[in-house]
Amino acid sequence: MTRSLKKNPFVANHLLNKIDKLNT
């Protein structure tokens, strides 16, 4: 999973934004 995130920073950023909205 970490490898694919490194290859796709856009996807990782999208997931981080999703988590951020859930935490808010």
From Swiss-Prot:
Keywords: Chloroplast, Plastid, Ribonucleoprotein, Ribosomal protein, RNA-binding, rRNA-binding. This is Small ribosomal subunit protein uS19c. It comes from the Eukaryota. GO terms for cellular component: chloroplast; ribonucleoprotein complex; ribosome. One of its GO terms (molecular function) is rRNA binding. Protein S19 forms a complex with S13 that binds strongly to the 16S ribosomal RNA. Belongs to the universal ribosomal protein uS19 family. It is found in: Plastid, Chloroplast. Its main location: plastid. The keyword Methyltransferase does not apply.
